[in-house]
Protein backbone atom coordinates (compact mmCIF):
# COMPACT_ATOMS: atom_id res chain seq x y z
CA UNK A 1 0.00 0.00 0.00
CA UNK A 2 2.84 2.39 0.85
CA UNK A 3 4.53 1.64 -2.45
CA UNK A 4 1.29 2.30 -4.32
CA UNK A 5 0.79 5.60 -2.47
CA UNK A 6 4.38 6.65 -3.20
CA UNK A 7 3.98 5.86 -6.90
CA UNK A 8 0.80 7.92 -7.07
CA UNK A 9 2.46 10.87 -5.35
CA UNK A 10 5.43 10.67 -7.71
CA UNK A 11 3.10 10.75 -10.71
CA UNK A 12 1.22 13.69 -9.22
CA UNK A 13 4.38 15.66 -8.56
CA UNK A 14 5.77 15.03 -12.03
CA UNK A 15 2.69 16.65 -13.53
CA UNK A 16 2.35 19.58 -11.16
CA UNK A 17 5.86 20.70 -10.27
CA UNK A 18 7.53 23.40 -12.38
CA UNK A 19 10.87 22.99 -14.12
CA UNK A 20 12.38 19.73 -15.37
CA UNK A 21 9.93 17.57 -13.40
CA UNK A 22 7.02 19.12 -15.32
CA UNK A 23 8.63 18.14 -18.60
CA UNK A 24 8.32 14.46 -17.72
CA UNK A 25 5.55 12.56 -19.43
CA UNK A 26 3.22 9.93 -18.03
CA UNK A 27 3.01 6.87 -20.26
CA UNK A 28 -0.10 4.71 -20.14
CA UNK A 29 -0.24 1.29 -21.79
CA UNK A 30 -3.41 0.46 -23.71
CA UNK A 31 -3.86 -3.14 -24.80
CA UNK A 32 -6.41 -4.56 -27.24
CA UNK A 33 -6.89 -7.67 -29.38
CA UNK A 34 -7.51 -6.04 -32.76
CA UNK A 35 -5.20 -6.63 -35.72
CA UNK A 36 -3.46 -3.74 -37.52
CA UNK A 37 -6.01 -1.77 -39.52
CA UNK A 38 -8.97 -3.02 -37.45
CA UNK A 39 -11.54 -0.69 -35.92
CA UNK A 40 -9.92 -1.28 -32.53
CA UNK A 41 -6.53 -0.29 -33.94
CA UNK A 42 -7.81 2.86 -35.65
CA UNK A 43 -9.90 3.88 -32.62
CA UNK A 44 -7.05 3.43 -30.13
CA UNK A 45 -4.66 5.38 -32.36
CA UNK A 46 -7.15 8.25 -32.66
CA UNK A 47 -7.64 8.26 -28.89
CA UNK A 48 -3.89 8.36 -28.26
CA UNK A 49 -3.58 11.34 -30.60
CA UNK A 50 -6.38 13.21 -28.81
CA UNK A 51 -4.92 12.53 -25.36
CA UNK A 52 -1.54 13.87 -26.43
CA UNK A 53 -3.17 17.01 -27.83
CA UNK A 54 -5.41 17.62 -24.81
CA UNK A 55 -2.64 17.17 -22.25
CA UNK A 56 -0.04 19.07 -24.21
CA UNK A 57 2.08 15.94 -24.41
CA UNK A 58 2.07 15.33 -20.65
CA UNK A 59 0.27 12.01 -21.13
CA UNK A 60 1.25 9.56 -23.86
CA UNK A 61 -0.86 6.49 -24.65
CA UNK A 62 1.26 3.59 -25.84
CA UNK A 63 -1.01 1.30 -27.89
CA UNK A 64 -0.33 -2.45 -27.96
CA UNK A 65 -2.68 -4.24 -30.35
CA UNK A 66 -2.99 -7.78 -31.70
CA UNK A 67 -3.11 -9.30 -28.18
CA UNK A 68 0.51 -8.26 -27.47
CA UNK A 69 -0.36 -7.73 -23.80
CA UNK A 70 -2.73 -10.71 -23.62
CA UNK A 71 -6.17 -11.76 -24.79
CA UNK A 72 -9.35 -10.07 -23.59
CA UNK A 73 -9.56 -12.07 -20.37
CA UNK A 74 -5.90 -11.53 -19.53
CA UNK A 75 -6.15 -7.82 -20.29
CA UNK A 76 -9.03 -7.36 -17.87
CA UNK A 77 -7.08 -9.22 -15.19
CA UNK A 78 -4.04 -7.05 -15.80
CA UNK A 79 -6.13 -3.87 -15.70
CA UNK A 80 -7.50 -4.89 -12.33
CA UNK A 81 -3.99 -5.67 -11.05
CA UNK A 82 -2.61 -2.41 -12.48
CA UNK A 83 -0.01 -4.02 -14.78
CA UNK A 84 -1.92 -2.71 -17.82
CA UNK A 85 -3.33 0.81 -17.61
CA UNK A 86 -6.07 0.71 -20.25
CA UNK A 87 -7.89 -1.95 -22.25
CA UNK A 88 -10.62 -2.18 -24.87
CA UNK A 89 -12.80 -5.16 -23.91
CA UNK A 90 -15.99 -6.08 -25.69
CA UNK A 91 -17.94 -9.32 -25.13
CA UNK A 92 -15.62 -10.36 -22.30
CA UNK A 93 -17.01 -7.62 -20.02
CA UNK A 94 -20.03 -9.85 -19.41
CA UNK A 95 -17.72 -12.46 -17.85
CA UNK A 96 -16.61 -10.07 -15.09
CA UNK A 97 -19.78 -7.94 -14.82
CA UNK A 98 -22.81 -10.12 -15.69
CA UNK A 99 -25.07 -7.12 -16.38
CA UNK A 100 -22.98 -6.34 -19.49
CA UNK A 101 -24.48 -9.53 -20.92
CA UNK A 102 -27.31 -7.24 -21.99
CA UNK A 103 -25.32 -6.69 -25.19
CA UNK A 104 -25.19 -10.45 -25.81
CA UNK A 105 -28.94 -10.48 -26.43
CA UNK A 106 -29.51 -11.23 -30.13
CA UNK A 107 -30.89 -8.41 -32.26
CA UNK A 108 -31.27 -6.11 -29.24
CA UNK A 109 -29.44 -3.13 -30.77
CA UNK A 110 -31.01 -1.99 -34.03
CA UNK A 111 -28.42 0.52 -35.19
CA UNK A 112 -25.84 3.01 -33.92
CA UNK A 113 -28.44 5.68 -33.13
CA UNK A 114 -30.24 3.14 -30.96
CA UNK A 115 -26.91 2.31 -29.30
CA UNK A 116 -26.34 5.98 -28.51
CA UNK A 117 -29.65 6.07 -26.62
CA UNK A 118 -28.81 2.86 -24.75
CA UNK A 119 -25.40 4.31 -23.89
CA UNK A 120 -26.99 7.40 -22.37
CA UNK A 121 -29.94 5.74 -20.62
CA UNK A 122 -28.54 2.36 -19.53
CA UNK A 123 -24.75 2.10 -19.84
CA UNK A 124 -23.83 5.18 -17.81
CA UNK A 125 -26.53 5.22 -15.11
CA UNK A 126 -26.73 1.43 -14.62
CA UNK A 127 -23.79 -0.56 -16.00
CA UNK A 128 -20.85 1.77 -15.32
CA UNK A 129 -21.46 1.97 -11.53
CA UNK A 130 -21.52 -1.86 -11.40
CA UNK A 131 -18.23 -1.99 -13.31
CA UNK A 132 -16.73 0.55 -10.90
CA UNK A 133 -17.62 -1.67 -7.94
CA UNK A 134 -15.95 -4.58 -9.75
CA UNK A 135 -12.71 -2.59 -10.05
CA UNK A 136 -12.90 -1.09 -13.55
CA UNK A 137 -13.05 2.58 -14.56
CA UNK A 138 -15.14 2.86 -17.73
CA UNK A 139 -14.11 6.01 -19.61
CA UNK A 140 -16.16 5.68 -22.80
CA UNK A 141 -18.25 3.38 -24.96
CA UNK A 142 -16.83 2.58 -28.40
CA UNK A 143 -17.61 -0.21 -30.85
CA UNK A 144 -16.72 -3.71 -31.91
CA UNK A 145 -19.66 -3.92 -34.29
CA UNK A 146 -22.44 -5.98 -35.87
CA UNK A 147 -21.43 -9.63 -35.97
CA UNK A 148 -21.59 -12.06 -38.89
CA UNK A 149 -20.90 -15.80 -39.19
CA UNK A 150 -18.16 -17.42 -41.29
CA UNK A 151 -17.55 -21.13 -41.76
CA UNK A 152 -16.18 -23.78 -44.12
CA UNK A 153 -19.13 -26.17 -44.34
CA UNK A 154 -22.17 -24.37 -45.77
CA UNK A 155 -24.04 -21.06 -46.03
CA UNK A 156 -25.90 -20.22 -42.82
CA UNK A 157 -29.42 -19.18 -43.78
CA UNK A 158 -31.14 -20.03 -40.51
CA UNK A 159 -30.44 -21.59 -37.10
CA UNK A 160 -30.87 -25.13 -38.45
CA UNK A 161 -27.82 -24.65 -40.67
CA UNK A 162 -25.65 -24.23 -37.58
CA UNK A 163 -26.37 -27.69 -36.21
CA UNK A 164 -23.14 -29.55 -35.52
CA UNK A 165 -20.88 -26.69 -36.62
CA UNK A 166 -17.86 -26.17 -34.36
CA UNK A 167 -17.99 -22.42 -33.89
CA UNK A 168 -15.48 -20.22 -32.15
CA UNK A 169 -17.04 -17.53 -29.98
CA UNK A 170 -15.46 -14.93 -27.66
CA UNK A 171 -15.27 -15.46 -23.92
CA UNK A 172 -18.76 -14.61 -22.72
CA UNK A 173 -21.26 -17.17 -21.45
CA UNK A 174 -24.28 -15.64 -23.17
CA UNK A 175 -22.72 -15.97 -26.62
CA UNK A 176 -22.07 -19.64 -25.87
CA UNK A 177 -25.66 -20.12 -24.71
CA UNK A 178 -27.02 -18.31 -27.75
CA UNK A 179 -25.26 -20.56 -30.25
CA UNK A 180 -26.07 -23.66 -28.23
CA UNK A 181 -29.74 -22.70 -28.54
CA UNK A 182 -29.23 -22.46 -32.32
CA UNK A 183 -27.78 -25.98 -32.41
CA UNK A 184 -24.11 -25.13 -32.96
CA UNK A 185 -21.19 -26.47 -30.92
CA UNK A 186 -19.61 -23.22 -29.66
CA UNK A 187 -16.21 -22.97 -27.97
CA UNK A 188 -14.83 -19.83 -26.33
CA UNK A 189 -11.37 -18.87 -27.58
CA UNK A 190 -9.12 -15.80 -27.66
CA UNK A 191 -9.03 -13.94 -30.98
CA UNK A 192 -5.31 -14.52 -31.50
CA UNK A 193 -5.89 -18.30 -31.56
CA UNK A 194 -8.72 -18.33 -34.09
CA UNK A 195 -6.86 -18.24 -37.43
CA UNK A 196 -4.90 -21.42 -36.70
CA UNK A 197 -8.00 -23.12 -35.27
CA UNK A 198 -9.85 -22.43 -38.52
CA UNK A 199 -6.87 -23.33 -40.69
CA UNK A 200 -6.38 -26.70 -39.01
CA UNK A 201 -10.07 -27.57 -38.78
CA UNK A 202 -10.19 -27.47 -34.99
CA UNK A 203 -13.02 -25.00 -35.58
CA UNK A 204 -15.38 -24.99 -38.58
CA UNK A 205 -16.28 -21.34 -38.23
CA UNK A 206 -16.40 -18.19 -36.13
CA UNK A 207 -18.47 -15.03 -35.73
CA UNK A 208 -17.19 -11.46 -35.69
CA UNK A 209 -17.76 -7.98 -37.10
CA UNK A 210 -16.48 -7.53 -40.65
CA UNK A 211 -13.55 -5.42 -39.43
CA UNK A 212 -12.23 -8.28 -37.28
CA UNK A 213 -12.91 -10.88 -39.99
CA UNK A 214 -11.01 -8.93 -42.65
CA UNK A 215 -8.05 -7.68 -40.62
CA UNK A 216 -7.59 -11.11 -38.99
CA UNK A 217 -7.47 -12.55 -42.55
CA UNK A 218 -10.16 -15.14 -41.85
CA UNK A 219 -11.15 -14.90 -45.52
CA UNK A 220 -7.99 -16.89 -46.24
CA UNK A 221 -9.26 -19.88 -44.26
CA UNK A 222 -13.08 -19.55 -44.53
CA UNK A 223 -15.40 -20.17 -47.49
CA UNK A 224 -18.77 -18.78 -46.42
CA UNK A 225 -19.79 -15.42 -44.97
CA UNK A 226 -23.39 -15.29 -43.74
CA UNK A 227 -24.78 -11.84 -42.92
CA UNK A 228 -26.71 -12.45 -39.73
CA UNK A 229 -26.13 -9.23 -37.74
CA UNK A 230 -27.01 -11.45 -34.77
CA UNK A 231 -25.40 -9.23 -32.13
CA UNK A 232 -24.09 -5.68 -31.95
CA UNK A 233 -21.15 -5.58 -29.56
CA UNK A 234 -19.96 -2.33 -28.02
CA UNK A 235 -16.41 -1.97 -26.78
CA UNK A 236 -15.43 -0.10 -23.63
CA UNK A 237 -12.42 2.03 -22.79
CA UNK A 238 -11.55 0.65 -19.37
CA UNK A 239 -8.87 2.07 -17.06
CA UNK A 240 -7.09 0.58 -14.09
CA UNK A 241 -7.97 2.51 -10.91
CA UNK A 242 -4.50 1.73 -9.56
CA UNK A 243 -2.89 4.06 -12.11
CA UNK A 244 -5.74 6.24 -13.28
CA UNK A 245 -6.88 7.36 -9.83
CA UNK A 246 -3.34 8.49 -9.01
CA UNK A 247 -3.39 11.09 -11.78
CA UNK A 248 -4.42 14.69 -11.08
CA UNK A 249 -8.16 15.28 -11.47
CA UNK A 250 -7.65 17.68 -14.38
CA UNK A 251 -5.60 15.07 -16.25
CA UNK A 252 -8.17 12.35 -15.56
CA UNK A 253 -10.87 14.58 -17.01
CA UNK A 254 -8.77 15.30 -20.10
CA UNK A 255 -8.21 11.60 -20.73
CA UNK A 256 -11.89 10.76 -20.30
CA UNK A 257 -12.94 13.66 -22.52
CA UNK A 258 -10.57 12.40 -25.21
CA UNK A 259 -12.06 8.90 -24.90
CA UNK A 260 -15.63 10.17 -25.18
CA UNK A 261 -14.84 12.60 -27.98
CA UNK A 262 -13.38 9.68 -29.95
CA UNK A 263 -16.79 7.96 -30.02
CA UNK A 264 -18.13 9.78 -33.14
CA UNK A 265 -14.92 8.86 -34.99
CA UNK A 266 -15.42 5.23 -33.94
CA UNK A 267 -19.04 5.09 -35.15
CA UNK A 268 -18.29 6.82 -38.45
CA UNK A 269 -15.28 4.62 -39.12
CA UNK A 270 -17.19 1.47 -38.16
CA UNK A 271 -20.05 2.29 -40.54
CA UNK A 272 -17.64 3.01 -43.40
CA UNK A 273 -15.73 -0.21 -42.79
CA UNK A 274 -18.97 -2.21 -42.89
CA UNK A 275 -19.64 -0.79 -46.36
CA UNK A 276 -16.11 -1.17 -47.71
CA UNK A 277 -15.10 -4.54 -46.31
CA UNK A 278 -18.05 -6.60 -47.51
CA UNK A 279 -16.99 -6.11 -51.13
CA UNK A 280 -13.36 -6.83 -50.28
CA UNK A 281 -14.27 -10.09 -48.56
CA UNK A 282 -16.44 -11.14 -51.49
CA UNK A 283 -13.73 -10.29 -54.00
CA UNK A 284 -11.32 -12.26 -51.84
CA UNK A 285 -13.29 -15.40 -52.62
CA UNK A 286 -15.85 -15.67 -49.82
CA UNK A 287 -19.38 -16.72 -50.77
CA UNK A 288 -21.76 -14.21 -49.18
CA UNK A 289 -25.42 -14.80 -48.31
CA UNK A 290 -28.16 -12.99 -46.42
CA UNK A 291 -29.51 -14.94 -43.44
CA UNK A 292 -33.13 -15.24 -42.34
CA UNK A 293 -32.95 -12.86 -39.40
CA UNK A 294 -36.56 -13.46 -38.34
CA UNK A 295 -35.79 -17.16 -37.91
CA UNK A 296 -32.79 -16.30 -35.74
CA UNK A 297 -34.84 -13.84 -33.69
CA UNK A 298 -37.50 -16.49 -33.05
CA UNK A 299 -34.85 -18.99 -31.93
CA UNK A 300 -33.33 -16.42 -29.53
CA UNK A 301 -36.19 -16.32 -27.01
CA UNK A 302 -34.58 -18.80 -24.55
CA UNK A 303 -31.50 -16.59 -24.24
CA UNK A 304 -33.64 -13.56 -23.36
CA UNK A 305 -35.62 -15.62 -20.84
CA UNK A 306 -32.48 -16.93 -19.15
CA UNK A 307 -30.87 -13.49 -18.92
CA UNK A 308 -34.09 -12.02 -17.50
CA UNK A 309 -34.16 -14.54 -14.66
CA UNK A 310 -30.43 -15.01 -13.97
CA UNK A 311 -29.16 -11.40 -13.98
CA UNK A 312 -30.46 -8.88 -11.43
CA UNK A 313 -32.71 -6.34 -13.20
CA UNK A 314 -32.08 -8.23 -16.44
CA UNK A 315 -35.70 -8.12 -17.56
CA UNK A 316 -36.00 -4.40 -16.82
CA UNK A 317 -32.81 -3.60 -18.75
CA UNK A 318 -34.00 -5.58 -21.76
CA UNK A 319 -37.40 -3.89 -21.74
CA UNK A 320 -35.84 -0.45 -21.45
CA UNK A 321 -33.35 -1.13 -24.26
CA UNK A 322 -36.12 -2.38 -26.54
CA UNK A 323 -38.24 0.69 -25.75
CA UNK A 324 -35.30 2.94 -26.62
CA UNK A 325 -35.25 1.29 -30.04
CA UNK A 326 -38.65 2.76 -30.77
CA UNK A 327 -37.47 6.21 -29.72
CA UNK A 328 -39.19 6.12 -26.32
Give, region by region, the residue ranges found by the protein language model:
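Bacterial N-terminal signal peptides that target proteins for export
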Residues: 1-9
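N-terminal secretory/targeting leader peptides
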Residues: 24-114, 120-328
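Cleavable N-terminal signal peptides
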Residues: 10-11, 21
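Sec/Tat signal peptide C-region and signal peptidase I cleavage site
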Residues: 17-23
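Absolute protein N-terminus
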Residues: 1, 23-24
Amino acid sequence: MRALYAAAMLTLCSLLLPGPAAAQTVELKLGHVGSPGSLFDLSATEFAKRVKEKTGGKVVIQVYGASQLGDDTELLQKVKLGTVDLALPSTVMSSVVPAFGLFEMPYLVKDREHMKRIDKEIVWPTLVPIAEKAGYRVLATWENGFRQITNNLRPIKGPDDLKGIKLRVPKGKWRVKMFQSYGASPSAMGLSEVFVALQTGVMDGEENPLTQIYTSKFQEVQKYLSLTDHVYTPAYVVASPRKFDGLPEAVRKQIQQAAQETQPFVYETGAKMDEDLLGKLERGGMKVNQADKQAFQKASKPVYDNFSTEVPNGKQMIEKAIALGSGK
